[in-house]
């Protein structure tokens, strides 16, 4: 209280009046949150000074080095998705490896001198040899062929652009191997931390057969698409398909990887939500809610790490889909206008539906994962009856809601783009704009030719 306040109070009391009340400062939401955090941390220090504090209240407890054997025991996500990781190693796409169970050594690692990388280099060299032969053959045939029709140019542009994705593999995939290893270790540590906190493991139902099915389906779909192009295009030789089999299969496997991880994020969020609901019904759940808040933040960080680890690969993925879809759609419509529908246009539409299907799966699964981890989890928190719990629990629920607001579970490609349903609509609108402009040029050119002939 200032000197002026004391003077006014003395003057009011001496005359039998009520002294003026203390002016309460007006705080904005950020200042109020900071003040409440400081008050709660001071309460924590007082509890610690009296020796009756709970170690996990308010602050994240210090991380400890876990037993690698225990990590392996509870790493059900690795065990159920191991088939896809092994397939990536065989194809030379992502040569990460499992480290021996030693202390202070991450369970998943990446080393340029490992046997997995050496195998990837060997496979990549063999595959690149075939790609170069096919690329040279297609370019030579296109340049020397007397048939310069537009549909021939469209087909060559599409399939040559697909071949170039092979040359981007070391830069887009191998270079980010350490980030992928970090992401895999985050999953391993998260599952064990979840078990220690809740007392029950995360169960991924049907993930093992689903992963195996996707591995087989990825290659079967690649074979089917390439053989369809072989039968629908007279100039597409059978040996060309051997260059495209691993490329299309790689695109399918990356789509499968994205689907599996998004599905696993939703499963982990649902398991955490169920454990939280059970804890809320117990006595004094504030201590556990602090750990649940840390688990949720870790889950949100894992979603962000997925996009960071595969940012270049999925960025290239989206660009290939965008470019191929525009060229194939324009080529098919243009040829139908000029010469009518043929089997070649059917082949172009197969490519269009394939590319748009991949983009839809990636964006739709990312949308569902973000909703399950974010909105659905937040909705369950808001439905908690806070009047039936103590003050510490109420505060922990509020802090968990703040954590969700401050760490939105967004699937982001390292800042390049957010993967959600909006990306689908944006791509479709861009493609429609480009197609309208290109078709306007096409119609104008036809009118000019018609006027000249008349």
From Swiss-Prot:
Q: Which GO terms describe its biological process?
A: detection of carbon dioxide; monoatomic ion transmembrane transport; response to carbon dioxide; sensory perception of taste; signal transduction
Deletion phenotype, per the entry, is: Impairs CO(2) avoidance of larvae.
* Stimuli inducing this protein: The Myb-MuvB complex mediates neuron-specific expression of the carbon dioxide receptor genes Gr63a and Gr21a.
**Mind telling me which GO cellular component terms the entry cites?**
axon; dendrite; membrane; neuronal cell body; plasma membrane
Name the major location: membrane
Localization, UniProt: Cell membrane
- Which residue ranges does the entry give as Extracellular-facing topology? 136-153, 228-237, 334-345, 444-454
The membrane topology noted for this protein in its Swiss-Prot or TrEMBL record is: Multi-pass membrane protein
Stretches of the chain found on the membrane's Cytoplasmic side: 1-114, 175-206, 259-312, 367-422
Signal peptide (UniProt feature, chain positions): none
Known function:
Gustatory and odorant receptor which mediates acceptance or avoidance behavior, depending on its substrates. Gr21a and Gr63a together are sufficient for carbon dioxide detection and avoidance behavior. It is possible that the CO(2) receptors Gr63a and Gr21a activate the TRPC channels through Galpha49B and Plc21C. This innate olfactory avoidance behavior can be inhibited by inhibitory interactions of the odors such as 1-hexanol and 2,3-butanedione with Gr21a and Gr63a.
Q: Where are the transmembrane segments?
A: 115-135, 154-174, 207-227, 238-258, 313-333, 346-366, 423-443
Organ and tissue specificity: Expressed in the adult labellar chemosensory neurons. Carbon dioxide-responsive neurons coexpress Gr21a and Gr63a in a pair of chemosensory receptors at both larval and adult life stages. A single bilateral neuron, expressing the Gr21a receptor, is responsible for CO(2) detection in larvae.
User: What does the sequence similarity comment in the record state about its family?
Assistant: Belongs to the insect chemoreceptor superfamily. Gustatory receptor (GR) family. Gr21a subfamily.
Q: Which organism is it from?
A: Drosophila melanogaster (Fruit fly)
Protein name as annotated? Gustatory and odorant receptor 21a
Single Gene Ontology MF annotation: olfactory receptor activity
